[in-house]
């Protein structure tokens, strides 16, 4: 007896999957705003500590204006200090995953592996040396079957973005 195949996805889920397949990326809101705030605050605290400045109350404004506190020659040292500090936080990886868990589950399934260390990229205004090419880990030998979650910690717009 033939059993009819039915689509188990809602129309919204199907549309999200089709967008991912056609565009190769998705822009979605985070699922855990408190987790995003905690990660952002952690990054701000680590950056201020490395720069030896008092952490302002408005951590979002601090990160949005970080270029006022660090120059291009000092950028990589600060970035590495923040990365090391982030990866020492036992809660951070699980919190990062919680930001997009259901979208990842829908798009790629639940049999996932997460890289061991969280990374960080920072671009300063008018700094062409820190701009990234189109991101494709397959060129460096990573699997073409991976999904990269990029989480902006600042307000991104036309000239204030990754590309």
Regions picked out by a protein language model, each given a short descriptive name:
Residues 32-35, 120-127, 139, 155-156:
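Short, solvent-exposed loop/turn segments at secondary-structure junctions
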Residues 19-20, 112-114, 126, 141, ...:
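A generic structural signal for short, solvent-exposed coil/turn residues
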Residues 41-45, 64, 125-129, 159-161:
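Short alpha-helical interface elements
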């Amino acid at each position: 007896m033939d059993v009819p195949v039915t689509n188990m996805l809602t129309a919204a889920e199907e549309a999200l999957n089709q967008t991912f397949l056609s565009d190769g990326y998705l822009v979605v809101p985070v699922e855990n705003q408190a987790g995003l705030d905690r990660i952002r605050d952690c990054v701000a605290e680590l950056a201020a500590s490395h720069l030896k400045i008092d952490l302002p109350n408005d951590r979002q404004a601090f990160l949005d204006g970080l270029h006022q506190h660090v120059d291009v020659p000092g950028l990589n040292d600060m970035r590495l200090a923040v990365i090391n500090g982030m990866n020492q936080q036992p809660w951070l990886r699980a919190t990062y995953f919680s930001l997009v868990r259901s979208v990842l589950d829908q798009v790629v399934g639940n049999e996932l592996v997460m890289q061991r260390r969280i990374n960080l990229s920072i671009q300063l205004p008018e700094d062409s040396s820190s701009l990234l090419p189109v991101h494709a880990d397959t060129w460096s030998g990573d699997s073409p079957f991976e999904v990269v979650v990029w989480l902006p910690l600042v307000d991104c717009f036309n000239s204030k973005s990754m590309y």
